[in-house]
From Swiss-Prot:
It is a multi-pass membrane protein. Expressed in shoot apex and panicles. It comes from the Eukaryota. Signal peptide: none annotated. One of its GO terms (molecular function) is identical protein binding. It is found in: Membrane. Its main location: membrane. Residues 28-38, 90-100, 153-167, 213-226, 273-286 are cytoplasmic. InterPro entries: Auxin_Efflux_Carrier, Mem_transp_PIN-like. This is Probable auxin efflux carrier component 8. Homodimer. May act as a component of the auxin efflux carrier.
Amino acid sequence: MVSWKDIYLVLEATVPLYVAMILAYLSIKWWKLFTPEQCSGINKFVAKFSIPLLSFQVISTTDPYDMNIKLIYSDILQKSLALLGFAAISKACCAEKFDWLITGFSLSTLPNTLIVGIPLLKGMYGEQAGKLLSQIVVLQSLIWYTLLLFLFELRAANGMATTTSSETTGLIWALVGFRWHIRLPLIVSNSIRMLSDGGLGMAMFSLGLFTALQTKIIACGAKRMLLALAIRFFLGPALMGMSSYAIGMRGVLLKIAIVQAALPQGIVPFVFAKEYNVQADILSTAIIVGMMVAVPVALAYYFAMIIPAIK
């Protein structure tokens, strides 16, 4: 059962992100500290340095020999269904075909597992949930962010990105390190940690700068906002639920998979969308509004799945 202490732990993890975003917003709206060109430079730093190093740190510190196979298969199936579905819809209905394929995939399958998910679901389902969500974070960083970057690069036709190599390096080191119990030299790990620890904070700072440069906070408009929230909080969990059930997941493991899919939008896809100028307004709105309703939505899914058990 979720306690007030568990909710406080979630707020403890998420409020600092909002502090970074609000400071960035005020630095543009009130203090006029940055020009649009400088804001673009900050976002490029986040995309090319902070996020790749954060991905390396997450992947290299997770044991690849202790993964839940059913969770991996269900995650792959969910993403595959989302890709195929949005590819078909985008081709049939949307003028910006590739843009909506990328945005729809990001909204439906890439939640904020690291910051919001782990503390919240540990309160709901215990330490087991934290361990499982760490594996999902690795899959996100290693496979799905790489695929997302590939889609962005395919759209831009501009070559490969630095994040791909950092994730591959992180996986190689994790395979070697956990197999033979080798640790990175402290001077190397501290150098990586210095930049990676600020990765999410800098991403939220970039989000605040982007929001401040828009004429209104809901930059994409009310209709697109509602569509984005519906994809994030309804379609994403539905796809994950169907995929997990089809793979054979039951009980607590199935519930964890569904609730983590109903978490608010991840920050990293926005950083990439801003860097490649692909519907960043939709993702920024999904993050801002989604973070505000994260706890109520997760609790709604949690209680909805325990009511049948009580009956």
